[in-house]
């Protein structure tokens, strides 16, 4: 356990030291910062804030994990698989951010390009790690269900789905970074109890990196992680749940990401249905993803506006409670 804490501390200190230099470089080169969607009026003042900060904590977490895993003879296939997805999905996010900021392409990678690259990463992960490790059984609330060839599309769905879910969650200061810290703390406990010390190392290292990033990402944020960070973190969580053979746990531990994604899907579907049925589109939520609904009118959407901190603490609490419930189901 000490090696993991040391690794996390190194990642924390490195990120805390490097982020200000990244911000200084960003501003010195007069790079255009974060663009704000015109519909999110309450966040327009944040336009121009440096973004792509995920580049820093990703590089730090990957290098520190490799260093400590090698030093403590924990450089396993599981570690390499997690770091592979972290790096590849980070590259996908980096390309998306790069096109938006440097090439002035508003949508970055189009949805088909992004999906194709995410699926490619999932295919490599499956055939190199999952299939090689004899995967094919899905853990459903503690019961192993043999899926055979169907486990392959499940893996792709899990990786792509949660990668995009965390991306949707990254919409207000500090929300995604601490939500993922809470999720990784839960997986650290699971990895420790299952004696998967290699995966424990990676989890704690990323926790250190994210806490270092949060120093500058908390409200008022001096930097955002960008798609380079959020897409990679979602892919990482999905990979960890698969590597631990505890896939089902991500539905509870990652309930915040599920809520955020579901709110968008419900909103779009209901709007299209009502427009076709009644001639005008209607909405379930004030705005999606769900954190914007909370900002504009609390849980009901009709109450007074919530501050970003209130939204953060509410959704962090949901993540923490669900993580504790998951651990209780597993070990009590």
From Swiss-Prot:
Its cofactor is Mg(2+). The chain crosses the membrane at residues 3-23, 52-72, 74-94, 115-135, 140-160, 172-192, 197-217, 223-243, 248-268, 311-331. Its EC number is 2.7.8.13. One of its GO terms (cellular component) is plasma membrane. It is found in: Cell membrane. It catalyses: UDP-N-acetyl-alpha-D-muramoyl-L-alanyl-gamma-D-glutamyl-L-lysyl-D-alanyl-D-alanine + di-trans,octa-cis-undecaprenyl phosphate = Mur2Ac(oyl-L-Ala-gamma-D-Glu-L-Lys-D-Ala-D-Ala)-di-trans,octa-cis-undecaprenyl diphosphate + UMP. Keywords: Cell cycle, Cell division, Cell membrane, Cell shape, Cell wall biogenesis/degradation, Magnesium, Membrane, Metal-binding, Peptidoglycan synthesis, Transferase, Transmembrane, Transmembrane helix. It is a multi-pass membrane protein. Belongs to the glycosyltransferase 4 family. MraY subfamily. Catalyzes the initial step of the lipid cycle reactions in the biosynthesis of the cell wall peptidoglycan: transfers peptidoglycan precursor phospho-MurNAc-pentapeptide from UDP-MurNAc-pentapeptide onto the lipid carrier undecaprenyl phosphate, yielding undecaprenyl-pyrophosphoryl-MurNAc-pentapeptide, known as lipid I. This is Phospho-N-acetylmuramoyl-pentapeptide-transferase. It comes from Streptococcus suis (strain 05ZYH33). The lineage of its organism: Bacteria, Bacillati, Bacillota, Bacilli, Lactobacillales.
């Amino acid at each position: 356990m000490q090696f993991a804490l040391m690794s996390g501390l190194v990642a924390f200190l490195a990120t805390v030291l490097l982020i200000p230099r990244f911000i200084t470089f960003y501003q010195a080169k007069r790079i255009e910062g974060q663009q704000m969607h015109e519909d999110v009026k309450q966040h327009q003042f944040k336009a121009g804030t440096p973004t792509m900060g995920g580049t820093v904590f990703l590089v730090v977490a990957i290098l520190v994990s490799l260093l400590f895993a090698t030093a403590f003879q924990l450089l396993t296939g599981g570690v390499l698989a997690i770091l592979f997805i972290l790096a590849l999905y980070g590259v996908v996010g980096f390309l998306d951010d790069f096109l938006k900021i440097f090439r002035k392409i508003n949508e970055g990678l189009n949805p088909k390009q992004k999906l194709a690259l995410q699926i490619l990463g999932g295919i490599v992960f499956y055939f190199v790690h999952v299939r090689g490790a004899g995967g094919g059984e899905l853990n459903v609330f503690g019961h192993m269900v043999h899926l055979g060839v169907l486990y392959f599309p499940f893996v792709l769905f899990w990786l792509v789905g949660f990668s995009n879910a965390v991306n949707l969650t990254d919409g207000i200061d500090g929300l995604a970074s601490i939500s993922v810290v809470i999720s990784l703390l839960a997986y650290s406990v699971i990895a420790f109890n299952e004696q998967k010390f290699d995966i424990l190392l990676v989890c704690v290292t990323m926790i250190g990196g994210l806490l270092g990033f949060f120093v500058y990402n908390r409200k008022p944020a001096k930097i955002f992680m960008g798609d380079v960070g959020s897409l990679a973190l979602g892919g990482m969580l999905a990979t960890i749940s698969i590597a631990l053979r505890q896939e089902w746990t991500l539905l509870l531990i990652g309930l915040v990401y599920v809520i955020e994604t579901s709110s968008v899907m419900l909103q779009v579907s209901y709007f299209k249905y009502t427009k076709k049925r009644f001639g005008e589109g209607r909405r379930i939520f004030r705005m999606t993803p769900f954190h914007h609904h909370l900002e504009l009118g609390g849980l009901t959407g009709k109450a007074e506006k919530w501050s970003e901190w209130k939204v953060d603490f509410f959704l962090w609490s949901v993540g923490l409670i669900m993580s504790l419930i998951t651990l209780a189901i597993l070990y009590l």
